[in-house]
Amino acid sequence: MLAHGSNDYGVSLKGNKTGSSPSKASSLNWNEPHTLNEQNTYCYCGKDRNLRFPDLQCSVCLNMFHLSCLSPPCTSMMGFSTNYQFVCKHCTEDGFERFERGVSAWKAITATAMANLVVKRYVETNPDVPVDSFNAEKMRNFQANTYFFKKKEDLIPFIEEHWQLLCPDREKVQTWQATLGSCLVANRDTYRAKDETMRNQNSEYALNNPNLFDFRSGYIFPFQRVGATVPKKRLVETETPPPSSSKLKEDYKDSKREMKRSNTPWSNASIKKNEVPTVPIRYKPPPWRDSDFETVPKLPIFYPNSSSPNFFSLSEIPFNRRGFRYSPCEAAKDLPNVMYREIELPPFTSRINWHDISTPVFIDHSALCATVEKGFRMARSNVFMTSGEWYFEIKIEKGGGDDGAHVRIGVSRREAPLDAPVGYDAYSYGLRDLGGQKVHMSRPRNFMDSFGTGDIIGLHISLPKPSFAQHTTLPSCHDRIPIRYKGQLYFEQPDYVPSKMMDELMIPSKHNRYIDLPYIPGSFIKVYKNGSYMGTAFENLLDFNPPNSINSNHYSFDDGSLGYYPSISMYGGGIARFQFGPQFSHRPLVLGSNVRPVSERYNEQIAEDVLCDILDEIDYAEDPNTSSVTIDVPQEPNAGITIIPEIKDITE
């Protein structure tokens, strides 16, 4: 039996690629459900349907298409599936197919499994029947409802073997076999028992409909998109259960939550005393499931961009959004208290973070280059800088010309919005291709000549380590909540959000000219264009350390992600490419060996994450109710009256 879209029998169904356009399909004589026609002509190839070659139905023209004829051939779906939405290339404006898997309802899973078992049994009992005999022309009167199957002996082994093809969005919970049995008993409209007077979970069942060619999108269960498995905001009260919409709610019902609180509050000009807790509640992680150790991490699904063939949009992963961020993780048996740890996906290097892009952004397979069709959108790297001397380059592959394509490049903090350009607010510093202006808080200021297509901009970032941090531990918390999203494990963490005070800095006001705002003394961003020094664009960068960053649950601490991220933003087809090193196009000779390529941060961050996991494991094993976080931190001595030039220019 053919379990998915690959051609296991060495028989090609492909023919003339112009075989069945919508206009030709509409001229054929179709049956009522639009699954069979008298001419036996389907798909791009114009060939007949065949029970041993899975196909799917276009939701627009309603023609049927072989999985092996798609571009590229689809190998991720079981034959006779019904939980999908497909649009053929003849019915899309850009000529690219659209395919999306939906929610896997047990009623549909069971029917799909049973249909495949029918074909499998027929092949086993008739091994000498040629493949062509399975064509719709010869199998229209095939009685699939005469084949009976048992739950334990037939359905359970088949579903177990083909779980990822049948229901990739589902976890294999302990009760799934009982759910399968209940589904068979309850759905008389779809399954019939061999003896209806003894209908129970141990009965033999067959499909009610004898025609396997009726299987199509929505046939068993209406198509429903797979939604996020987590709420937009988590509750943090100690006795409040998690939101009912959480897919993991059953794992939390009996979990005790442990508090990690401070005794000494922080003080800051922008934060009132005792207003912002420095350490959040610790949630006990949900228990492992057997399937957690069998799940193979997957990359995002890449969909080609019609206007830029080398760029792709991403799907099948959660994207960072205001107040929440995501990273792939796995169950860790060697960490029985921490229980879950973050993992890396290829390419294993400094690159654009799959999750940390605005959804309209298109990226290439190297994950170093990005573009967008409309509006300014941002993409952030998966590495960030906290202290030290760093250098990276950005190549402008398209921008700064008269065609409307533009880029803005620079660095940003976690709070900076992804649906805005670099330099939009107080959380990012950017350079504008048009006019070569530097931009902070959306206020452009003259800095250098324009740059555009072919230019390479080098950025030297200096973030001196504050003297007070050498003998003081900043508030930190590494706790993360695992969630399940489309069959994969991810950490969900409250991300840092803009404060009201920082947002108000964007409004021109004489009162904002001088403000009590912490910064990093001696920090700067120096700029090079094609290896030539352009000057220092920014000095005394705003401090990102607690309490200057507060997450969406109103806590002020470092979760291991605070720092400045290399960032690119594109507009109207602009294209920018990161060059993180160690090999650069125009590394200035004046930079000493102490200025490191940003590529070195990748392995450093992994080591930092592993170290935090080990320390947390030791800490929680000794006493799960004790926090290892040190809170008593003096106020940064250099945080005080800061003259913000962007505001000074407006008010004078």
Swiss-Prot record:
Q: Where is this region: Disordered?
A: 1-32, 234-270
Q: Where do Polar residues bias regions lie?
A: 15-32
Among SMART domains, the record links this protein to: SPRY
Q: Which GO terms describe its biological process?
A: negative regulation of gene expression, epigenetic; transcription initiation-coupled chromatin remodeling
The GO terms this record gives for MF are: transcription cis-regulatory region binding; zinc ion binding
Q: Does the keyword Nucleus apply?
A: yes
Q: Does the keyword Metal-binding apply?
A: yes
Positions of PHD-type zinc fingers: 40-94
Gene deleted: what happens?
Results in a delay of sporulation and a substantial drop of sporulation efficiency. Causes a reduction of H3K4me2 level in the coding region of spk1, as well as a reduction of the expression of stk1, mei2, mam2 and map3 genes.
Q: Mind telling me which residue stretches traverse the membrane in this protein?
A: none
Per UniProt, subcellular location reads as: Nucleus
Q: Which residues bind Zn(2+) 2?
A: 58, 61, 88, 91
**A GO CC term assigned to this protein in UniProt:** chromatin
Where is composition skewed (Basic and acidic residues) in this entry?
247-261
Start and end of every B30.2/SPRY domain?
Answer: 330-519
Q: Which Pfam families does the UniProt entry name for this protein?
A: ASH2L-like_WH, PHD_ash2p_like, SPRY
In terms of PANTHER family, this protein maps to: SET1/ASH2 HISTONE METHYLTRANSFERASE COMPLEX SUBUNIT ASH2, SET1_ASH2 HISTONE METHYLTRANSFERASE COMPLEX SUBUNIT ASH2
Full protein name: Set1 complex component ash2
Q: Which organism is it from?
A: Schizosaccharomyces pombe (strain 972 / ATCC 24843)
